[in-house]
């Protein structure tokens, strides 16, 4: 291992979670020990890890008691040894390894205590004992440290591995008591070399999952988000905490740094047997900021974009504010040009997500085959309610208009009270603008990959400056 990694391990051992304020505006992930245990168990199911152990000691005369074992040249049971009568007993090999039961204990500030309880079936043969079959219960106990890989990902590193041999039973054949004792001693010596590599293989699989936490997630036409570790991970007796820093990049790969909230997030306590991930206000600001700078929040609304019950003509406008038309005749189509010149403001608090979009609305009279005539301009604020739906990889957002307030900025005829148009404008925005806006929001807010935790069925909790997703394993 590299010296730098050892140094990180030492520092990690001193790090334990603190309750209260989250001193970051990044993404916080709390991985419950049950989720870690499930990842380890899944790595053993259906994979090659256990099958590889079966091929370790299989060839005749190469078994535990074969040519290279106790019966081999110089072994205790070799020719001339104390038990030369059974010198031909050979080929004792692992025939089956029962799917281990996984037990996890988190050691705050230290690492992980990992136990695998399994049952090993062995068989062999000899001229005196005939077909021989043994079954042994084994507990593999290992101490695992949390470290950081050279590329900055969290990594589990095996520090110590021991095997404790439990009950051994003879399921077939005859074996003299002295030989049975020697077999037991041999298994105690050999099994660590066979089963501890299983732990190494399991950790390799889990480390691949942990490495996927720090990944580049596309944001569609807006760019991408790269998740990196902001600080060293922390360990409590119930969960591992990862402080993840989301780095937003443009399509060209340039880092985009939107303003971040100054106040830290006060995290709610995590319940036992649950995992959490937070989506910070910063990511909401980033997505809406990118939409604004890319012009995705701007829209020109024509009569074809609204249903017939929401007319866009000078006749209907005259009924609400006749002084706004000047000398224009009735029956002409209207064009509404919506421009968002500043980034929207997102408010996360009191279990509610509110989006405020400052908008400038230009109202023009559209003349067939002619240049539109500017009538007046309004400045307004669209207040939108957000509905959040988590999936496996994203937090999806859909918006609905709560209210639209406007003030007259300029008029080419007479001044008037623009608030009289708010209800009519709200109908137009709901019919035409909200659909386009929600289409742009289909990119969603990406979630970091946390040990394949599926947040699709998570409970969504909106707290101040963050959204918390909680899922039970």
UniProtKB/Swiss-Prot annotation:
Glycosylation positions in this chain: 139
Annotated keywords: Disulfide bond, Glycoprotein, Secreted, Signal
Endpoints of the signal sequence: 1-20
Tissue: Highly expressed in olfactory mucosa but undetectable in thymus, kidney, lung, brain, spleen and liver.
Residue pairs linked by disulfide bridges in the UniProt entry: 161-196
Segments crossing the lipid bilayer: none
GO molecular function terms noted in the UniProt entry: lipid binding; odorant binding
The keyword Secreted is annotated on this UniProt entry: yes
Superkingdom classification of source: Eukaryota
Major place of residence: secreted
A Gene Ontology term for the protein's cellular component: cytoplasm
Record's subcellular location: Secreted
Described function: May have the capacity to recognize and bind specific classes of odorants. May act as a carrier molecule, transporting odorants across the mucus layer to access receptor sites. May serve as a primary defense mechanism by recognizing and removing potentially harmful odorants or pathogenic microorganisms from the mucosa or clearing excess odorant from mucus to enable new odorant stimuli to be received.
Record-linked PANTHER family: BPI FOLD-CONTAINING FAMILY B MEMBER 3, BPI FOLD-CONTAINING FAMILY B MEMBER 4-RELATED
Family label: Belongs to the BPI/LBP/Plunc superfamily. BPI/LBP family.
Protein name: BPI fold-containing family B member 3
Organism, scientific name: Rattus norvegicus
């Amino acid at each position: 291992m590299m010296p730098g990694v050892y140094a990180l391990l030492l520092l990690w051992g001193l790090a334990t979670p603190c309750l209260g304020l989250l001193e970051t505006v990044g993404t916080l992930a709390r991985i419950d020990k049950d989720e870690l245990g499930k990842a380890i168990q899944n790595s053993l199911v259906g994979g090659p890890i256990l099958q590889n152990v079966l091929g370790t000691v299989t060839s005749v005369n190469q078994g535990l008691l074969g040519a290279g074992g106790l019966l081999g040249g110089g072994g205790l049971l070799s020719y001339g040894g104390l038990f030369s009568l059974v010198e031909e007993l050979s080929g004792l090999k692992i025939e089956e390894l029962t799917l281990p039961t996984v037990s996890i204990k988190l050691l705050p500030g230290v690492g992980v205590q990992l136990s695998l309880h399994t049952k090993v079936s062995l068989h062999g043969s000899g001229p005196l004992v005939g077909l021989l079959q043994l079954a042994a219960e084994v507990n593999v106990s290992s101490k695992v440290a949390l470290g950081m890989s050279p590329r900055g990902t969290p990594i589990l590193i095996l520090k110590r591995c021991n095997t404790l041999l439990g009950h051994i039973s003879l399921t077939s054949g005859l074996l003299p008591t002295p030989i049975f004792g020697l077999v037991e001693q041999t298994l105690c010596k050999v099994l660590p070399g066979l089963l501890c590599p299983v732990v190494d293989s399991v950790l390799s699989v889990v480390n691949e999952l942990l490495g996927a936490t720090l990944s580049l997630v596309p944001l569609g036409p807006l760019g991408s988000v790269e998740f990196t570790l902001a600080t060293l991970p922390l360990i409590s007796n119930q969960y591992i905490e990862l402080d993840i820093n989301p780095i937003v990049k443009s399509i060209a790969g340039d880092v985009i740094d939107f303003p971040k909230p100054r106040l830290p997030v006060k995290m709610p306590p995590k319940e036992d047997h649950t995992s959490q991930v937070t989506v910070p206000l910063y990511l909401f600001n980033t997505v809406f900021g990118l939409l604004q700078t890319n012009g995705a929040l701007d829209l020109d609304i024509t009569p074809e974009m609204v249903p017939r019950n929401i007319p866009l003509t000078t006749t209907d406008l005259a009924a609400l504010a006749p002084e706004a038309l000047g000398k224009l005749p009735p029956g002409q189509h209207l064009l509404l040009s919506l421009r968002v010149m500043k980034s929207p403001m997102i408010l996360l608090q009191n279990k509610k997500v509110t989006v405020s979009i400052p908008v400038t609305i230009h109202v023009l009279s559209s003349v067939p085959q002619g240049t539109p005539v500017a009538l007046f301009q309004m400045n307004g604020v669209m207040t939108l309610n957000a509905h959040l739906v988590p999936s496996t990889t994203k937090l999806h957002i859909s918006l609905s208009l709560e209210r639209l307030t406007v003030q007259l900025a300029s008029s080419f005829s007479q001044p008037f009270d623009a608030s009289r148009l708010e209800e009519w404008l709200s109908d137009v925005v709901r019919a035409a603008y909200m659909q386009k806006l929600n289409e742009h929001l289909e990119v969603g807010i990406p979630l970091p990959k946390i040990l394949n935790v599926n947040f699709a069925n998570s409970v969504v909790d909106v707290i101040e400056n963050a959204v918390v997703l909680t899922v039970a394993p």
